[in-house]
């Protein structure tokens, strides 16, 4: 098997030339992408829209690519949302010649879905430095950069170490609740207990740093009910908005209130717990007293458990409303929630950081003692924006980073 990261299309020079030499002969950004199988693969998957719920097309492309590189590919069906693609699937793959046959020691995983809207692939040339060529479009960072870099890191590793026990897992639905990873995790055939792997490497945009952990998550609506009436005679009704506002004001400040005074906990590692009231829906018209109001809340937990946070929030709502039973938190509306996730950072040569965003890490059940790493190219600060973009240099560095994590895991296994 040729080395996928270093094998470039012929451009009239000897095959012994270095990748840097070959790329320097390309005259445009498009030529550079075309000349690199790795960058071309990244381009190809970004060009396929895969907004959560509609991942089948990109999944098919990735699966066929892996099969063409002598991987055994298992397509695990994942239930669809009410308006989603009923044929979507997770991809679990491993080298067909692997001695572990579906029980890899080392698992690399990321997700193939993206947030909306689809933004076409674009290139922004840098005549002075090929590494600074900017690649824009939805998924260029989150998380198709990780998908591409993980695949090519594995292919490169297998060329030098054909018996390395490696597996790849690419899931759907990460951006909207993690159903893809939970479906894989709950499958006792694909994810048996105890875990067959000793290392899991998760791919998300971390700016090429190893992540020591990320905050926990709790989502829920706060609901208020009232009585509709003509706005000229508001005393004939009961405003759900007026009832909801004191609760929202209190909940919105819980991350700033000391825990001893009824606030949400902080930690030295993750800082403050943060509260975001992301959406409010209420009423039907300005001249009607609103009979209902609902606010969607997301809390990023710096410490404690979801159950502990629920108790704090519920108490705050009761106190703010004087115990009004018409204002309440519907914690059953969203399943799960999770505590802060502590991760491994024991591989030298990386910057180490923490992040505030959520990942599929808590959705994958693993045995105690399994190493979990979170690493990937690009910045979360552009990942969901209309300016989502990544450089060629960041992509290429991520391949090296994933290979370094793989090699550390291989060497650790040899020592045990």
UniProtKB/Swiss-Prot annotation:
UniProt keyword terms in alphabetical order: Glycoprotein, Hydrolase, Metal-binding, Protease, Secreted, Signal, Zinc
Enzyme class: hydrolase
Cofactor entry: Zn(2+)
Active site, renumbered: 174 (proton acceptor)
Signal peptide as annotated in the record: 1-16
UniProt GO BP: proteolysis
UniProt KW Secreted keyword: yes
GO cellular component: extracellular region
Enzyme Commission identifier(s): 3.4.17.-
Binding of Zn(2+) 2, residues: 142
InterPro entries for this protein: ArgE/DapE_CS, Bact_exopeptidase_dim_dom, Peptidase_M20, Peptidase_M20_dimer, Peptidase_M20A
Residue positions with a glycan: 54, 70, 129, 187, 319
Gene Ontology terms, MF aspect: metal ion binding; peptidase activity
Pfam families: M20_dimer (PF07687), Peptidase_M20 (PF01546)
Cofactor-binding details, from the entry: Binds 2 Zn(2+) ions per subunit.
Residues at which Zn(2+) 1 binds: 142, 175
Predominant location category: secreted
Subcellular location: Secreted
Homology family: Belongs to the peptidase M20A family.
Name listed for the protein in its UniProt record: Probable carboxypeptidase An18g06210
Organism annotation: Aspergillus niger (strain ATCC MYA-4892 / CBS 513.88 / FGSC A1513)
Lineage: Eukaryota, Fungi, Dikarya, Ascomycota, Pezizomycotina
């Amino acid at each position: 098997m040729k080395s996928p990261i270093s094998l470039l299309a012929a451009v009239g020079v000897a095959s012994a030339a270095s990748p840097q030499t070959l790329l320097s002969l390309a005259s445009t950004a498009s030529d550079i992408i075309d000349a690199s199988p790795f960058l071309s693969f990244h381009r190809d998957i970004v060009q396929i829209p895969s907004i959560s719920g509609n991942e089948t097309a990109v999944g098919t492309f990735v699966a066929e690519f892996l099969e063409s590189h002598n991987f055994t590919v298992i397509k695990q069906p994942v239930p669809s949302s009410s308006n989603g693609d009923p044929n979507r699937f997770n991809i679990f793959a491993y080298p067909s010649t692997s001695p572990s046959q579906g029980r890899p020691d080392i698992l690399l995983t990321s997700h193939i879905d993206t947030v909306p809207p689809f933004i076409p692939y674009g290139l922004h040339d840098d005549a002075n430095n090929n590494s600074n060529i900017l690649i824009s479009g939805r998924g260029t960072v989150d998380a198709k950069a990780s998908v591409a870099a993980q695949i090519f890191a594995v292919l490169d590793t297998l060329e030098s170490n054909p018996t390395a026990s490696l597996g790849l897992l690419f899931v759907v639905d990460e951006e909207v609740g993690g159903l893809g990873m939970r479906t894989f995790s709950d499958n006792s055939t694909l994810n048996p207990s105890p875990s067959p792997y000793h290392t899991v490497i998760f791919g998300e945009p971390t700016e090429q740093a190893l992540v020591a952990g990320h905050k926990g998550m709790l989502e829920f609506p706060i609901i208020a009910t009232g009585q509709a009436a003509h706005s000229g005679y508001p005393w004939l009704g009961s405003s759900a908005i007026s009832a909801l506002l004191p609760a929202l004001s209190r909940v919105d400040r819980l991350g700033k209130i000391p825990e001893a005074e009824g606030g949400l906990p902080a930690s030295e590692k993750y800082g403050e717990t943060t509260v975001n009231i992301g959406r409010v829906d209420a009423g039907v018209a300005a001249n009607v007293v609103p009979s209902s109001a609902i606010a969607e809340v997301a809390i990023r937990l710096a410490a404690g458990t979801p159950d502990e946070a629920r108790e704090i929030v519920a108490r705050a709502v009761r106190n703010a409303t004087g115990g009004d039973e018409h204002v309440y938190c519907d914690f059953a509306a969203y399943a799960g929630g999770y505590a802060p996730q502590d991760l491994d950072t024991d591989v030298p040569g990386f910057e180490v950081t923490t992040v505030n965003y959520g990942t599929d890490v808590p959705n994958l059940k693993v045995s105690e003692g399994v190493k979990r790493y979170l690493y990937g190219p690009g910045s979360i600060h552009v990942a969901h924006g209309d300016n989502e973009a990544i450089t060629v240099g960041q992509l290429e560095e991520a391949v090296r980073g994933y290979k370094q994590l793989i090699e550390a895991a291989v060497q650790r296994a040899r020592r045990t």
